[in-house]
């Protein structure tokens, strides 16, 4: 999908679905975005936040996003979400969009969720969304990792890690999750 089409889909559909009745500011003043890729969601959300830190695994994407965000409220860190270089309980909120299906195994997905839990402050909010498994999306990922997360298992996985107030919703295209780190 072309970047302009994807940006419109993010703005008009994906982000409103992911946040539901919440606003970006509900994430607090020090927010973490995991896996921003080229930063399309970063562009759309950063204006509604005080401080945003984005952690991106791909060095080229992290560098390009860092250059583009210089002088803004966004700090870009090149790093692995399964082993984040942040102190525990640093962030008031965390978010990730259309990224989990790029994590190669269920175990690494759970490790990533555990790291998000670790770096969230007690009571911190996680907002996440991704696509549901489909043959069409699998075809788009022929030369890429495609390991969609089953939303039917997500509540138990989050609860095991320590999240509470877990809300999961699905539709024909994807799922959204909102959860809080237990105080």
Question: Predicted regions span which residues?
Answer:
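Class I SAM-dependent transferase core
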Residues: 1-11
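Conserved alpha-helix/loop element of class I SAM-dependent methyltransferases that forms part
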Residues: 9-29
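Class I SAM-dependent methyltransferase SAM/SAH-binding core
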Residues: 32, 37-83
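A conserved beta-strand element that flanks and buttresses the S-adenosyl-L-methionine
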Residues: 95
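Short catalytic micro-motifs in class I SAM-dependent methyltransferases
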Residues: 98-102
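A short glycine-rich, Lys/Arg-flanked "PGG" loop and its adjoining helix->strand segment in the class I
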Residues: 110-122
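C-terminal alpha-helical "lid/dimerization" subdomain adjacent to the S-adenosyl-L-methionine
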Residues: 125-178
